[in-house]
């Protein structure tokens, strides 16, 4: 399976981070840690929410420069909302991901941010898309990114399975974030998770001291 590693070792305030999105039977879960850092060493915030709602059932999560990511998602939300009004229907997840792709590609010389877009629509159900730094767009059943992803490729490959239940998928995502946050010095804080289905959106926040532990920390 193709996977994309988003390098977040950049100057300025960055979300040296762990982000992921996973489809399950009937929905998709998108998640991240909550730590922001400067230069990969100074922790500037422990409570950044890296999951951005761009439409009712479409979210993206960010890795890289926090300023770049906020600027791109703000522009994307405007374009996606305008598109939805024009079409008189909710936007497709792929359409939202394509907006992010165009913004990243058109500004690839200046931007230092990558994105995962996930959501649910009536045409294709749950979907996950990776938008790379240069604007490349990939559709995948699950993806991981950020500096913490280095530590969980093996876990994700071994434990992911298609058509998981919601509970199995939540456990998979929680364990993956916990493993990455336990090893990566620029991932940490709390685990933010959003469950997206036809019925709606559910937010889950797991404090750092409530995350599963797999080794002495």
Swiss-Prot record:
GO CC annotations on file: cytoplasm; nucleus; proteasome core complex, beta-subunit complex
- Enzyme Commission number, as recorded: 3.4.25.1
**Assigned keywords, A-Z:** Cytoplasm, Hydrolase, Immunity, Nucleus, Protease, Proteasome, Threonine protease, Zymogen
Cite a single Pfam family from the UniProt record.
Proteasome
Q: Name one GO biological process term.
A: immune system process
Q: Which PROSITE patterns match?
A: PROTEASOME_BETA_1 (PS00854), PROTEASOME_BETA_2 (PS51476)
Q: Chief subcellular site?
A: cytoplasm
Q: Where in the cell is it found?
A: Cytoplasm; Nucleus
- Catalysis: reaction(s): Cleavage of peptide bonds with very broad specificity
**Chain residues in the propeptide:** 1-16
Query: Which SUPFAM superfamilies does the record associate with it?
Result: N-terminal nucleophile aminohydrolases (Ntn hydrolases)
Q: What's an example of a GO molecular-function annotation for this chain?
A: threonine-type endopeptidase activity
Q: Where is the active site?
A: 17 (nucleophile)
InterPro entries membership: Ntn_hydrolases_N, Pept_T1A_subB, Proteasome_bsu_CS, Proteasome_sua/b, Proteasome_suB-type
> What job does this protein perform?
The proteasome is a multicatalytic proteinase complex which is characterized by its ability to cleave peptides with Arg, Phe, Tyr, Leu, and Glu adjacent to the leaving group at neutral or slightly basic pH. The proteasome has an ATP-dependent proteolytic activity. This subunit is involved in antigen processing to generate class I binding peptides.
Record text on subunit structure and interactions: The 26S proteasome consists of a 20S proteasome core and two 19S regulatory subunits. The 20S proteasome core is composed of 28 subunits that are arranged in four stacked rings, resulting in a barrel-shaped structure. The two end rings are each formed by seven alpha subunits, and the two central rings are each formed by seven beta subunits. The catalytic chamber with the active sites is on the inside of the barrel.
User: Which family does the similarity line name?
Assistant: Belongs to the peptidase T1B family.
Q: What's the name of the protein?
A: Proteasome subunit beta type-6-B like protein
Organism, by scientific name, is: Salmo salar
Q: What is the lineage of its organism?
A: Eukaryota, Metazoa, Chordata, Craniata, Vertebrata
């Amino acid at each position: 399976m193709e996977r994309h590693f988003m390098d977040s070792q950049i100057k300025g305030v960055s979300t040296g981070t762990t982000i992921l999105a996973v489809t399950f039977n009937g929905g998709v879960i998108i998640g991240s840690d909550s730590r922001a850092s400067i230069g990969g060493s100074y922790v500037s915030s422990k409570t950044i929410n890296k999951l951005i709602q761009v439409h009712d059932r479409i979210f993206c999560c960010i890795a890289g420069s926090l300023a770049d990511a906020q600027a791109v998602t703000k522009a994307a939300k405007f374009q996606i909302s305008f598109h939805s009004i024009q079409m008189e229907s909710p936007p497709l997840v792929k359409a939202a991901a394509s907006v992010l792709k165009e913004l990243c590609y058109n500004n690839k010389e200046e931007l230092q941010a990558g994105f995962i877009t996930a959501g649910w629509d009536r045409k294709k159900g749950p979907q996950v898309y990776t938008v790379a730094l240069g604007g490349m767009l990939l559709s995948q059943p699950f993806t991981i990114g950020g500096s913490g992803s280095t530590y969980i490729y093996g876990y994700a490959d071994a434990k992911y399975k298609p058509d998981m239940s919601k509970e199995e998928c939540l456990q998979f995502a929680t364990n993956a974030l916990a493993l990455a946050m336990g090893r990566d010095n620029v991932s940490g804080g709390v685990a933010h998770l959003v469950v997206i289905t036809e019925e709606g959106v559910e937010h889950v926040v797991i404090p750092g001291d409530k995350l599963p532990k797999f080794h002495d920390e």
